[in-house]
Structures are given as C-alpha cells and as structure tokens.
Amino acid sequence: MQNQRIRIRLKAFDHRLIDKSTVEIVETAKRTGAQVRGPIPLPTRKERFTVLISPHVNKDARDQYEIRTHKRLIDIVEPTDKTVDALMRLDLAAGVDVQISLG
C-alpha cells in the first residue's frame, strides 16, 4: 500500500467522545508503523433553535437551544496492511460518526 493515504473524518456532538476516539485511532496507527498527521480540529458547526414557550400569547417568552457538531480530521500517510486491519477492528464510541476515504 505504498503512496496511499487514509483520510478519517470524525463527527460528534460531544467533544470528549471525539477526542477520545481520535486518541485511540492515532495510537493504533502509530503502533502499527504508519505516519499520522493530525488530529486537525475542523470548524465546529453551531445550530441554534428558538422555541416559543407559551402555546398562545406571550411572544417574549422563548427558549433557545444550541447543537454543536465537533469535527476532526486525521491523515494516515503510508499505511501498512497491519494498520488497515487494526483500524477495521477498532471499536469506537457509539456517538461518533466515522468517514474513511482512501486516496
């Protein structure tokens, strides 16, 4: 697998889960002899919602909610066959979305 690159994008609502998962991925890749670039923190997406509290009147009574989507990027340069096998066997947290692309 020479001249290959594995790009891993992680998304999660909880920053502690995503940081824990990135540490596991980086340690696994380094243990198998691959060169790792990252984790690179990407911009956090903030979605804000405003909801009326009162069902009829009182337009001023509102609640505001926010959902933050944290993202990280990890590049694994020159992965070995052991690296790919170890990453496939890796068990990550349930709240983390993982996208893997080969390039």
UniProtKB/Swiss-Prot annotation:
Q: Name one GO biological process term.
A: translation
Q: Enumerate the SUPFAM superfamilies for this protein.
A: Ribosomal protein S10 (SSF54999)
Which GO-annotated molecular functions does the record name? structural constituent of ribosome; tRNA binding
Taxonomic superkingdom: Bacteria
Asked if Ribosomal protein is a keyword of the record, the answer is: yes
- UniProt KW keywords: Ribonucleoprotein, Ribosomal protein
**Is the keyword Endoplasmic reticulum in the record?**
no
Q: Which GO terms describe its cellular component?
A: ribonucleoprotein complex; ribosome
- What PROSITE patterns has UniProt attached to this entry? RIBOSOMAL_S10
Region forming the signal peptide: none
UniProt cross-references to Pfam families, sorted A to Z: Ribosomal_S10 (PF00338)
Xref: InterPro entries: Ribosomal_uS10 (IPR001848), Ribosomal_uS10_CS (IPR018268), Ribosomal_uS10_dom (IPR027486), Ribosomal_uS10_dom_sf (IPR036838)
Q: Relate the protein's function as given in its record.
A: Involved in the binding of tRNA to the ribosomes.
Partners and quaternary state? Part of the 30S ribosomal subunit.
Q: Which family does it belong to?
A: Belongs to the universal ribosomal protein uS10 family.
Query: What is this protein's name?
Result: Small ribosomal subunit protein uS10
